[in-house]
Curated annotation (Swiss-Prot):
Binding residue positions for substrate: 10, 32, 59-68, 122, 184, 193, 213-214
Protein's recorded name: Orotidine 5'-phosphate decarboxylase
UniProt lineage: Bacteria, Bacillati, Bacillota, Bacilli, Bacillales
Organism: Bacillus anthracis
SMART domains given in the database record: OMPdecase
Similarity comment text for this entry: Belongs to the OMP decarboxylase family. Type 1 subfamily.
Keywords: Decarboxylase, Lyase, Pyrimidine biosynthesis
GO biological process: 'de novo' pyrimidine nucleobase biosynthetic process; 'de novo' UMP biosynthetic process
Main EC class the enzyme belongs to: lyase
Active site: K61 (proton donor)
Length: 238
């Protein structure tokens, strides 16, 4: 199964994760562990998932002073996760410090984790960005600005909406990693994300990775839902 498809393990605890993963016995997935699960279970959940053979995107969106982020990333790299992230709004010094921490903490003989930055959350509308955050750019301009800053700071890519991918390819080049959440099957509810797309649309727009949560985790048959998403994402029959 494709490892450019990331399954969001948005569960409150390990018991729910274990129950969900029973549907995928023998499969090596790329999974996302977010704040709720990591703060509840700690590094033990990472160890458990690695022992099961899964790749891990640890989605903690670090945003602090450079020295603190550097130290935190050093610790996260020692867990042997595959992808981590920060908020681009933390600035270039913070992002450069994140890379330094990952290099220092990576396990011997292994590459450092992929490091990406959040430009704007997928729940952010342009009206919200201007009125509440105080950024007087269009949403597209703000995302492109942060993506360029991210690349200049030495990170591998960004978390962004699928709708922003074509513009970011222009600004940052074809090798720049774009990780796109807010992915839903056409039959699903949008829920709390404003800028959403289907797996097929994400493929057409050129996303590097897609993150899918509820469409798979809340499905009556998670494995079949996973295969449906994979088929739409890769454009092949499974």
């Amino acid at each position: 199964m494709s490892q450019s498809l990331i399954v969001a393990l948005d569960f409150p605890g390990k018991q729910d994760v274990e129950q969900f993963l029973r549907h995928f016995e023998g499969e090596e997935l790329f999974v996302k562990v977010g704040m709720e699960l990591f703060y509840k279970e700690g590094p033990a959940i990472i160890t458990y998932l690695k022992e099961k053979g899964h790749k891990i995107f640890l989605d903690l969106k670090l945003h602090d002073i450079p020295n603190t982020v550097k130290s935190a990333m050093r610790s996260l790299a020692s867990l042997d996760v595959d992808m981590v992230n920060v908020h681009a709004g933390g600035g270039s010094s913070m992002m450069k410090a994140a890379i330094e921490g990952l290099e220092e903490g990576k396990q011997e003989g292994k590459e450092r984790p992929i490091c990406i930055a959040v430009t704007q959350l997928t729940s952010t509308s342009e009206t919200m960005m201007k009125k509440e955050i105080g950024i007087e750019k269009t949403l597209e301009e703000a995302v492109a600005h942060y993506a360029k800053l991210t690349k200049e700071s030495g990170l591998d890519g960004v978390v962004c909406s699928t709708l922003e991918v074509p513009k970011l390819r222009e600004v940052c080049g074809s090798e720049f990693v774009t990780v796109t959440p807010g992915i839903r099957l056409a039959s699903d509810d949008v829920n709390d994300q404003v800028r959403v797309a289907t797996p097929k649309r994400a493929r057409e727009l050129g996303s590097s990775y897609i993150v899918v949560g509820r469409s798979i985790t809340k499905a009556e048959n998670p494995l079949e839902a996973y295969k449906t998403v994979k088929q739409q994402w890769e454009g092949v029959t499974v």
